[in-house]
Amino acid sequence: MIRSSVDRIMLHVCLALLPTTAWGLYLFGWPAIYLWLLTCASAVACEAACLYLLGRPLRRLLDGSALLSGWLLALTLPPWAPWWIAVGGSMFAIGIGKQLYGGVGQNVFNPAMLARVALLIAFPLQMTTWALPLPLGTEGAPGWLEGLRITFAGGALADGLSGATALGHLQTELTLGHSAAQILDGHFALLPAFLGYSGGSLGETSELLILLGGLWLLALRIIHWEIPLGMLLTVGALAALANQIDPQVHGGGLFHLTSGGLLLGALFIATDPVTSPISRSGRLIFAIGCGALVFVIRSWGNFPEAVAFAVLLMNALVPLIDRVCRPRAYGRNARGKPLVAAKWTRQVKEVDKV
């Protein structure tokens, strides 16, 4: 039974994530399944522990917010990451990113992205080691027992089982003096990237399934169109412009739109109603800022993927954006002060005419 609007939102977002999650679990096999289960279970367990220690009712677990935070974090992790990445990241997301601010609806930053950035800074090797797709049941794919060993015993991936993402490969090869066109010609194909046959984080492989889930949320009016559309258009426009100016260094707009976690971030992460602006104009400003930061960090930053950094930086500006874009109260000026009598009378007459 859905108990509140919060429960309803969390349920529908989880349902929208199911297609891309199921595809990622199939594509990367048993280690990815264990990672996803561990991350979600750890997030819920940490939420329960925090509620108990703070003397809050445990029924708040039923709102699904902890499960969703763990789920989103899992989708942004390398699919064969060790167990302690899953557990530690979930504990950080819930304990620091959520409960430290007062619980659901009070957090300033997106908990999943805060945890991902913390993991990336603390454990850069584990967070940038990517397994190649080995679908369940295919030759060479680890069975359930081998998957347990990979997840819980750890160990470096063999060269034949690991590879760089398209964004990471571009960044590395550019430092060696190769042009972007040469690099992407043999390492990036648009259709496989869109359909979901390329490596990367657990939940970012199939742009098609992410898009379908996001469109469903838009149809239900659970998310607003301004953030995903504004963010994607900004990244695409800046990337296309940069590619026209200097094609030797910059990939094109379609490459940036279908690579990494941009689509997942635009539809499922940046649209978090708690950490995004409340007004339409504010959401557009937020989206453009996120998109611009994604492109800038991808192009000149130390990390090839930039969605988490961009979202967190713009989360910090949300209070300012809300203040600047706050609708003017009736009978008051833009600063919130009462209008003088003449202006007030004119405003009333204009309303009466309507």
From Swiss-Prot:
GO biological process: electron transport chain; transmembrane transport
Keyword Repeat on entry: no
EC number, UniProt record: 7.-.-.-
GO annotations of cellular component type: plasma membrane
Species per Swiss-Prot/TrEMBL record: Stutzerimonas stutzeri
Keywords in alphabetical order: Cell inner membrane, Cell membrane, Electron transport, Flavoprotein, FMN, Membrane, Phosphoprotein, Translocase, Transmembrane, Transmembrane helix, Transport
Protein name: Ion-translocating oxidoreductase complex subunit D
FMN phosphoryl threonine carried by residues: 165
